[in-house]
């Protein structure tokens, strides 16, 4: 069977459902596909299809995630739904499923619960830019006042985590009734998707951001100079442009005198390309894996940062024993291991803990032995002798 061509006639946006267990995230996901399928904008997926999510491995961590796609009148969406709470935590920290925005599902029968809060906090820390609220199970609440109270509570909660709680749309839905085909609840799913279209901003394309390429390998070509290879993470680089080499050693400038891909010469390389860049006046020993080539002034190297970290369980290939403050692992950042130290940590809710056990989630302060190009929202792995023992995201740059 020939593969279907991916139509690029609508902007593509990645979203997901987040919220407390049993508040109806998966049912709502199924409802969206059911309602949109009637307009020919989705394939019907039922609860079991989505709930039986296959296991995926990202950075050595096993995560269950379901991927659903559908479109509205103006956009094409890829939607992720995770069956278990632990899967969400891992997913958001490793960035396995990038989210440009999320639908926060909260049951009107319960109101915001522990994981509702945790998912909002996670969304804030890993940089999910916008949320829309689906107040689910509204068919089960007869009293309009109760629904209004729950809505107020959610808005206050969102504001307390620096989301614009007063402005975020809250749509009253019933995933179950929409699947059963009740017209008024189907209309509510349409209303929800209109809110998603209008309130989750179209992501800035990687190509439009300032140029960055992490160096994976370095060669010297006799008579031509030094070539750095890697995958361009974002932006565009043109032949003749000045760039900076950042990280590990002092930042220095150079000019790109050639861009090659698959042994062919190009005028420019763009986000997603695996290229070799010929650098003027640079010796092979001046640069190494782990440095980044960037648009001048767009990024600075740092040594101290705060991060949100998930520490792998023993069964996931992690440590068998706890670690304490002062622990010195390697931090795998973009393309290389950099030795560093975890100088301090707290539990994910900010409470003090003496030690970190396999399977814990922590906030940590890390200090690297040499400065590298780290940015807020960037993912990293924590490794020990080449095996991953944790995954994290940079929540704040300190210095």
Swiss-Prot record:
The tr-type G domain extends over 10-204
Q: Where is this region: G4?
A: 136-139
The primary location reported for this protein is cytoplasm
Positions of GTP binding? 19-26, 81-85, 136-139
Segments of this protein annotated with the region G2: 60-64
* Keyword check for Membrane: no
Q: What is its EC number?
A: 3.6.5.3
Instruction: Write out the GO MF terms.
Output: GTP binding; GTPase activity; translation elongation factor activity
Listed under subunit, the entry gives: Monomer.
UniProt name for this protein? Elongation factor Tu
Write down the species. Synechococcus sp. (strain WH7803)
**What taxonomic ancestry is recorded?**
Bacteria, Bacillati, Cyanobacteriota, Cyanophyceae, Synechococcales
């Amino acid at each position: 069977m020939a593969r279907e061509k991916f139509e690029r006639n609508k902007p593509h946006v990645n979203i997901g459902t987040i919220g407390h267990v049993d508040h109806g995230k998966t049912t709502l996901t199924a409802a969206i596909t059911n309602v949109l399928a009637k307009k020919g904008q989705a394939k019907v997926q039922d609860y079991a299809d989505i709930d039986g999510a296959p296991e995926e491995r990202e950075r050595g961590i096993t995560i269950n995630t379901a991927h659903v796609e559908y479109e509205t009148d103006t956009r094409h969406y890829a939607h992720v739904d995770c069956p278990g709470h632990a899967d969400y935590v891992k997913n958001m920290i490793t960035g396995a499923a990038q989210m440009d925005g999320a639908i926060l599902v909260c049951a009107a029968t319960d109101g915001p619960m522990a994981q509702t809060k945790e998912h909002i906090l996670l969304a804030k820390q890993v940089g999910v830019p916008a949320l829309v609220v689906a107040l689910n199970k509204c068919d089960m609440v007869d009293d309009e006042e109760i629904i209004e109270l729950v809505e107020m509570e959610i808005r206050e909660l969102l504001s307390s985590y620096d989301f614009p709680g007063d402005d975020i749309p809250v749509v009253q839905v019933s995933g179950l009734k929409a699947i059963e085909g009740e017209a008024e609840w189907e209309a509510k799913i349409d209303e929800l998707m209109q809110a998603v279209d209008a309130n989750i901003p179209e992501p800035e394309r990687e190509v439009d951001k300032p140029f960055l390429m992490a160096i994976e390998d370095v060669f010297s070509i006799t008579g031509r100079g030094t070539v750095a290879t890697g995958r361009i993470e974002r932006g565009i680089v043109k032949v003749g442009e000045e760039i900076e080499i950042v990280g590990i050693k002092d930042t220095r400038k150079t000019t790109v005198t050639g861009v090659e891909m698959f042994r062919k010469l190009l005028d420019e390389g763009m986000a997603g390309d695996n290229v070799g860049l010929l650098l003027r006046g640079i010796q092979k020993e001046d640069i190494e894996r782990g440095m980044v080539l960037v648009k001048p002034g767009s990024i600075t190297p740092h040594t101290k940062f705060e991060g949100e970290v998930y520490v792998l369980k023993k069964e996931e290939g992690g440590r068998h024993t706890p670690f304490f403050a002062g622990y010195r692992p390697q931090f795998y950042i973009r393309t290389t291991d950099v030795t560093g130290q975890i100088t301090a940590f707290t539990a994910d809710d900010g409470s003090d803990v003496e030690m970190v056990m396999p399977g814990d989630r922590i906030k940590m302060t890390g200090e690297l032995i040499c400065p590298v190009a780290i940015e807020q929202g960037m993912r990293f792995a924590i490794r020990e002798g080449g095996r991953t023992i944790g995954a994290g995201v940079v929540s704040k740059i300190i210095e």
